Amino acid sequence: METFAEYILREEDFAKKIEIMFYLKKKTNIFFDNTVIFKALIVKLFIESMEIDIDENKVVTAMLLCGCKKINNAQDIEKIKSYAKEGADFLSKLGFSKEFCLICEQHNRYSNSFPRKKESDILELADQFGGMLLDRPERVAFPIEEALILLENRNLKNCNNYYLNEFKEFINIVKEIKVW
């Protein structure tokens, strides 16, 4: 019998993946909303536009799933630090490989697991940058320029993200053609 992991990874159509995620949310009550779709779209556009040599389908799927155990209460710091690990454990039960689960777990740096996967660096960029572009209960969305500066000089200060320079180039291209 096919696992959920095999099922969603076999599907390469983005819209159909979104539909699969919608039904997974209904069945398991995972975290899945428009912010997840927005960040996954950033991943997809980044990989395609910059011609990144990586398994796009796997990374987009990971972006859709990496926050599956996220909570809406951003005030609980312990939950913020543990949701990626809890999500990776949950994904393992759905049949995802150790590598895939590690990619999802490493999308934030709280797991402290090394070496980091390149795919995790892409998730980290889309998650943090995309999050800054969205309104939150505690703040309004940042303008693109400010979000990019904060990403580099605050969020990823003293962090080695393999794709940061390419991501900045991508955002500047997107900004010029006024996609956002």
Protein language model annotation of sequence segments:
Residues 1-84, 179:
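Acidic/His-rich, divalent-metal-binding segments that scaffold phosphate/diphosphate chemistry
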Residues 32-36, 90, 118:
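Amphipathic alpha-helix face/heptad-repeat signature
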Residues 45-49, 90, 154:
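A generic secondary-structure signal
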Residues 59, 63, 91-125, 130, ...:
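Histidine/acidic-rich helix-loop-helix segments that form or flank divalent-metal centers
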Residues 70-72, 131-134:
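Short small-residue beta-strand/loop micro-motif enriched in glycine and branched aliphatics
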Residues 87:
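Alpha-helical segment that forms one wall of the substrate-binding/catalytic cleft
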